[in-house]
């Protein structure tokens, strides 16, 4: 099936009003974030999904810019009818700080000097990127994200979001990524950086307005691009075919198709990316490590999100064992986690190319709504011993029709409704326990919303207190919430 694109889009810009304090302790002012949004934010701002880009990505994740020859880098996933359906969700994607596609980075103008930062730009980390994104999300007035999703370096950001802001992320989807950078990953990044700094035109990062280190950056891209492919995909794409010739030349010219391909990838990359940004972003990847006391489980102990962790069989840059390690760490903390290992020959680039399988897996996870996704968390309750008059006053002031009665340790004892209050007046009763419901029908936060709806329909009730495993009241879900969900999605 062919799906529509979202059409033409524009990049927006947000300037953080205060200084951004970095993990290194340094501060940077006048930070700008380039971002794009797709879809419509609903009235209670509960349908927002943050998409985090990979090393060489940007804010342009979907749709078309005027004059573009191709759409945004994840157009296969974002748009009407796709997993990130813009008819349902409000999608946000921003360029990371340290980047070169509109957000503040080493190629930006340093307000103190009036010239490009170059290496005066402070080193940033994945945590710094996420903290900057948090400023943007606050600016958009969003208190909780329905999901945060990203592949590769984007997956690192997803994991950092779940650790730094656990109460802001309902669903986390890290793809083709890791809980920490391995020595092999760091080694590949270092070779790329050496290629750049060895270019005479790099000039210690002060090349803006001069000849740029295109040779070094192209070589770094060629090295990196090899790690994004797989042996199978290279066999299928190139084999041992020669480029525009039938016999060996017995010299050192480019003879094989794969050689021409890599040179083309390197050359075109230099036209859209900044060499210093490549240094900064790969360094941020190297520093990424969520373990505490050499334990990833310890580092992920405070996460609250539901997780979908996705790997690809042929990915040797972020191999499946690293994604399974994330799953095991989450499971050790009793986190709600689903793991999917997708069969693919595309290597690490699978997350950008596997449209069919990835859309299917993502759609199944995102469209499965649980009670915790729509329940009202900050609800009023009353304690045992309260009078009917006091209960009625709470209902009136809070403009609610259902009021859970709880014990001193917040465990559910009963439920008082506005109907019960009316009944007490008719019966001239002043004993709350006589008129309240004692055998309360409840919901659990991890229940599918369909099950909660069935309970309401079968019992002819309009609200369910949500309780945890110890019967403590943690929220309320109403028929109105469910009806609104159906209307929106």
From Swiss-Prot:
What is the first-listed, main subcellular location in coarse terms?
A: cytoplasm
State where substrate binds. 221, 349
User: Which family, according to the similarity comment?
Assistant: Belongs to the AB hydrolase superfamily. MetX family.
* Domain CBS: residue ranges: 375-434, 436-489
**Subcellular locations according to the entry:** Cytoplasm
Any one Gene Ontology BP term: homoserine metabolic process
Q: Which UniProt keywords apply?
A: Acyltransferase, Amino-acid biosynthesis, CBS domain, Cytoplasm, Methionine biosynthesis, Repeat, Transferase
Task: Locate the active site.
Answer: 152, 315, 348
**Name of the protein this chain belongs to:** Homoserine O-acetyltransferase
Gene Ontology cellular-component terms listed? cytoplasm
Q: What is its EC number?
A: 2.3.1.31
């Amino acid at each position: 099936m062919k799906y529509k694109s979202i059409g033409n889009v524009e990049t927006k810009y947000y300037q953080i009003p205060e200084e951004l304090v970095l993990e290194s302790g340094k501060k940077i002012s006048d930070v700008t974030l380039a971002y794009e949004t797709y879809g419509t934010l609903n009235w209670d701002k509960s349908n927002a999904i943050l998409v985090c880009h990979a090393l060489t990505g940007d804010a342009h994740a979907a749709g078309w810019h005027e004059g573009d020859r191709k759409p945004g880098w994840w157009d296969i996933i974002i748009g009407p009818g796709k997993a990130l359906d813009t008819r349902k969700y409000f999608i946000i994607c921003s360029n990371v700080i340290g980047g070169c596609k509109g957000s503040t980075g080493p190629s930006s103008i340093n307000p103190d000097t009036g010239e490009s930062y170059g290496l005066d730009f402070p080193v940033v980390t994945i945590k710094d990127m996420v903290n900057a994104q948090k400023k943007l999300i606050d600016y958009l007035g969003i208190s909780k994200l329905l999901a945060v999703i990203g592949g590769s370096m984007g997956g690192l950001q997803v994991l950092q979001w779940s650790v730094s802001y656990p109460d802001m992320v309902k669903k986390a989807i890290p793809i083709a990524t890791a809980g920490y950078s391995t020595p092999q990953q760091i080694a590949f990044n270092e070779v790329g950086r050496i290629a750049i700094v060895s270019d005479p035109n790099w000039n210690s990062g002060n090349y803006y307005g001069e000849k740029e280190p295109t040779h070094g950056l192209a070589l770094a891209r060629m090295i990196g691009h090899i790690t994004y492919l797989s042996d199978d995909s290279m066999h299928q794409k190139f084999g041992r075919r020669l480029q525009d010739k039938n016999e060996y030349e017995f010299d050192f010219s480019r003879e094989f198709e794969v050689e021409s391909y890599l040179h083309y990838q390197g050359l075109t990359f230099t036209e859209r990316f900044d060499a210093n940004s490549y240094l900064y972003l790969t360094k941020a990847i190297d520093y990424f490590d969520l373990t505490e006391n050499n334990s990833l489980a310890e580092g992920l102990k405070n996460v609250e999100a539901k997780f979908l962790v996705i790997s690809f069989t042929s990915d040797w840059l972020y191999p499946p064992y690293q994604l399974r390690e994330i799953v095991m760490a989450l499971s050790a903390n009793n986190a709600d986690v689903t793991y999917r290992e997708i069969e693919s020959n595309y290597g690490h680039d699978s997350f950008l190319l596997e449209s069919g399988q990835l859309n299917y897996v993502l759609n199944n996870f995102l469209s499965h709504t649980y009670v915790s996704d729509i329940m009202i968390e900050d609800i009023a309750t009353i304690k045992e011993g309260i009078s009917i008059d006091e209960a009625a006053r709470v209902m009136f002031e809070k403009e609610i029709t259902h009021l859970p009665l709880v014990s001193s340790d917040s465990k559910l004892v009963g439920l008082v409704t506005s109907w019960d209050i009316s009944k007490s007046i008719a019966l001239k009763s002043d004993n709350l326990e006589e008129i309240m419901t004692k055998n309360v029908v409840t919901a659990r936060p991890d229940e599918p919303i369909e099950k909660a709806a069935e309970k309401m329909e079968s019992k002819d009730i309009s609200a369910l207190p949500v309780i945890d495993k110890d019967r403590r009241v943690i929220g309320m879900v109403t028929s109105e919430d469910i009806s609104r969900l159906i209307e929106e999605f």
